[in-house]
């Protein structure tokens, strides 16, 4: 770091800071595709994703998502004592939900309107409560998750931090380290919609 760079205090710190968004994406990906591994001297520890912890509340859609899929799953979860508040789906599934409501037969344009179609869907309302719709690009397109956000989340074991590595030659090396886990309480308070197509 013998050269000063305009707008950058330390190129090394800049590169270390750039690693954190990528690591956060890996954590988000783990929520949907994670598997449990206890770890050993040669195998890294790994935490399971949502599908590992969600219990028996499952609805098999077998095609495009329908409002009845969400309603039936909400009923199952309600009977088991759950009160979910989120519907987490792939963007393609969210578009299909939107298309159930916003079709050309419902579009009306007059002089006071300067847009065509409906805005994005924010909530799915059911007899058993409202679900905030969350689109996530890492969510499998064939699965939707109905979850209680108060009973599911990430736990920080070690926050992200920079650790220096051994010096070789005149180079400076380091790594960004953080350790997180996924907590899910009351597995029957959540559910999945499987077999979705978009």
Put a short name on every predicted segment.
Residues 44-67, 96-198:
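Sequence/fold signature of self-assembling virion shell proteins
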Residues 2, 9-29, 83-86, 91, ...:
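Internal mixed-charge
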Residues 69-87:
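Amphipathic interfacial helices
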Residues 32-36, 87-90, 110-113:
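Short coil/turn segments at secondary-structure boundaries
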Residues 1-75, 198:
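Alpha-helical scaffold segments that mediate packing/assembly in large oligomeric complexes
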